[in-house]
Amino acid sequence: MKKMNKLTWTMLMGAGLILGACSATDTSDEASESAAVETVTYTTVDGEEIAVPASPERVVVLSSYAGDLINFDVNIVGVDAWSAGNPNFSEGLSGVAVVSNADVEKILELEPDLIIGLDNIENADQLSEIAPTVLFTYGELSYLDQIVEIGKVVNKEEEAVAWVEAFQAEAQTVGEEIKGAIGEEATVTVAENFDKQMYIFGDNWARGTEILYQEMGLNMPETVKENALDAGYYAISEEVLGDYIGDYLILSLAATDPESSFLDAEWFKNIPAVQNNQVFVADAETFYFNDSLSLDYQLDFFEESFLAE
């Protein structure tokens, strides 16, 4: 057997190192890909099974669930315009792209590993080709069950359940304090002025309604109960607002809304709740939502408003 000269040995060793490095790189890449595609099975309320990332890192949210993902420390890369306009989300959505279901190409460029939205969107089939897509029917679940369901989708069910339990306990405690301050029989109305139309709300249409009526057990006026409880909301003309206002009014107003001149109208000033200084004005952009982050904020708002010394 011939002995290898130094040059041949050196060349073979070099080739071996290169091959070894390539092999190590390939193994590393395979491990990275394996970690990146690790999935768990999410089962929808209709029984459909969807493979979703075990630890989603690039989520596009096309509906009002961004606050839950922020609260559960899940990274968002794309979000709907309504959520982007919520000042309470600004820190959690810093640098996040604003998209809609129509922006298929833009969403593709974001390279999401999970898409969450409502089932009334267009392009759902195209979106599901980009990433696992989970769509919900608005109002199909109770507002707290919806939060837990979002937790399941992003593999944060334990965190979601713990939040719900703590929130309910706190809301009920604060509710008892509020009843003690305003009286067991006091009535509360939630109203909002939007696009030259006034709306009153039932007990499950965001804007703090779930907290006031479901968790705290506060009373709504009979006129609100008759018209808005089942439907969720009821549109009225501004001038008849007084017919629906209880002892207290939660008025949701957009900070930039040019249609708030009614606040200076005589008919508004003559409403008893207004005359008694029992109107609490909330920023509509923070009240449109009923995700966990927004509910925490709304609960604090009610505690400070009703129990202010």
Regions found by a protein language model. Give the residues of each.
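Bacterial Sec-exported substrate-binding components of ABC uptake systems
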Residues: K2-W9, G20-V61, E159-A191, A254-E259, ...
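Short helix-initiation/N-cap motifs at beta->coil->alpha
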Residues: T44-D46, S94-E105, A228-E238
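Second-shell loop/turn segments in exported
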Residues: E49-V52, P56, T133-F136, E149-V164, ...
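A short, structured surface patch at a secondary-structure boundary
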Residues: R58-E109
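Alpha-helical, coiled-coil/dimerization segments enriched in small aliphatic residues
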Residues: S83-N86, I200-G232
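Proline-aspartate-enriched helix->loop->beta-strand connector
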Residues: V104, E111-I116, P132, L241, ...
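Structured C-terminal subdomain patch of bacterial secreted/periplasmic proteins
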Residues: Y244-E309
